[in-house]
């Protein structure tokens, strides 16, 4: 009997180990912040003051927040105007241009196929795309001609996901490649496959894995999703990510009735906000057009802030949310490991995994990074979109933090916003 009791106690403790704790499968929206969250309700007012001040001063047209700890949403507020000119107030379910937030979705889609055994992370890209170059740029001449040499090592899928491939890494060469790949006989390409096969024929800016440079490699990842799955990127992403997670308002294309929910984008010119309503997330493709064949993989998605919060919570949960598993825990852990050489072009001690920027683990490595707040936990993941939609996933604190506005250029409000969130933690 005594032995049985001891065994029961052991089983009890094993069953309650941190690794086996349940992950929140839905968001909870309490009327007041629970004390168990250890969040100062009074200090959350700093968030409101910051964002309202930026709106009142005309620095940003609007701001939308979504902050949750352990699945409990403790700040989800809308500030400002969806459209300043008409006086239309921002709503929590408005649609935003996500731009490069598309990249993480594409990366996850590709990694679901990795889990299915379709490829190894260090497989050469040329194994699946024979058109892929094996040349590195040596010299680009003023007339557009260039000389090359053979790569020191093959371009791999790991390099694509970590933005260390060298594709489009030279700005002048990237312009040449972009101009060519976006146009065929003076009209845009009809499919992602056509576009990517044109892009990968250009020489690389550096040997794969030797540098970091933000580039259109995510489009290549998107084509590989189509190659391995046998389905259009849009269909596969809906099937494996958007629908399982309940991201019902996220897409590349929409029926016309959704237009009224899309916030107006703004540019800052001479100190004033100027409406640019016809700015689209992607390479000029109207999300309300009839031709929906082309879906860019590095940009192009639109959606609500809660939809993307669902994606972030899935990552935080180790691959599962809404009762559906998208990726395995070990795959998420692999994606969260730095892949870059140091130093690199990303900045002092810049770290990037397989789809996400990573806050360095060592405090000494973080002090020289100007665009990082020192408040954020080491190991956190983040990225965002060109029109200032940002997200952060903090496993240590159990936090997901999102701030959306559709305004360029950057106002640095993201870093200030992060400070106001973290200072409220008790």
What does each model-found stretch correspond to?
Residues 24-36, 140, 181:
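Short, contiguous pre-domain boundary segments
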Residues 35-97, 118, 137-141, 286, ...:
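Short, conserved catalytic-motif segment at the N-terminal edge
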Residues 2-8:
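Sec-dependent signal peptide recognition
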Residues 390-392, 397-407:
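Short, well-ordered beta-strand elements
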Residues 48-51, 71, 96-129, 133-134, ...:
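Active-site SXXK
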Residues 14-15:
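C-terminal motif of bacterial Sec signal peptides marking the signal peptidase cleavage site
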Residues 135-375:
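Short, surface-exposed loop or secondary-structure junction motifs
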Residues 369-395:
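Low-complexity, glycine/alanine/valine/leucine- and proline-rich hydrophobic stretches
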């Amino acid at each position: 009997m005594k032995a049985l009791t001891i065994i029961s106690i052991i089983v009890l403790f094993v069953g309650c180990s941190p690794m086996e704790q349940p992950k929140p499968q839905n968001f909870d929206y309490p009327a007041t912040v629970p004390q168990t969250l250890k969040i100062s309700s009074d200090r959350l007012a700093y968030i409101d003051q910051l964002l309202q001040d930026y709106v009142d001063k005309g620095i940003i047209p609007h701001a939308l927040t979504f902050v949750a700890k352990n699945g409990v949403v403790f700040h989800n507020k809308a500030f400002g105007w969806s459209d300043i000119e008409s006086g239309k107030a921002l709503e929590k379910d408005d649609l935003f241009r996500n731009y490069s937030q598309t990249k993480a979705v594409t990366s996850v889609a590709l990694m679901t196929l990795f889990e299915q055994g379709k490829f190894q992370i260090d497989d050469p890209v040329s194994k699946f795309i024979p058109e892929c170059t094996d040349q590195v740029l040596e010299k680009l001449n003023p007339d557009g001609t260039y000389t090359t040499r053979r790569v020191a090592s093959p371009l791999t899928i790991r390099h694509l996901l970590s933005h260390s491939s060298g594709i489009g890494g030279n700005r002048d060469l990237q312009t040449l490649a972009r101009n060519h790949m976006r146009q065929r006989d003076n009209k845009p390409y009809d499919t992602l496959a056509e576009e990517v096969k044109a892009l990968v024929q250009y020489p690389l800016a550096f040997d794969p894995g030797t540098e970091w440079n933000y580039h259109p490699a995510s489009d290549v990842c998107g084509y590989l999703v189509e190659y391995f799955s046998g389905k259009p990127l849009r269909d596969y992403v809906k099937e494996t990510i958007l629908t399982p997670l309940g991201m019902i308002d996220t897409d590349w294309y929409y029926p016309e009735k959704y237009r009224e929910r899309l916030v107006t984008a703004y540019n800052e010119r001479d100190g004033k906000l100027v409406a640019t309503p016809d700015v689209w997330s992607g390479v000029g493709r109207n999300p309300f057009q009839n031709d929906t064949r082309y879906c860019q993989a590095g940009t192009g998605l639109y959606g609500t802030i809660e939809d993307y919060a669902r994606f972030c919570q899935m990552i935080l949960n180790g691959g599962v949310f809404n009762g559906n598993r998208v990726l395995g825990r070990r795959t998420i852990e692999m994606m969260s490991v730095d892949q870059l050489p140091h130093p690199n072009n990303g900045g002092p001690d810049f770290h990037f995994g397989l789809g996400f920027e990573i806050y360095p683990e060592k405090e000494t490595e973080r002090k020289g990074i100007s665009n990082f707040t020192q408040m954020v936990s080491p190991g956190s993941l983040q990225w965002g979109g060109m029109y200032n939609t940002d997200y952060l996933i903090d496993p240590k604190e159990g936090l997901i933090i999102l701030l959306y506005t559709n305004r360029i250029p950057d106002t640095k409000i993201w870093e200030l916003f992060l400070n106001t969130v973290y200072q409220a933690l008790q």
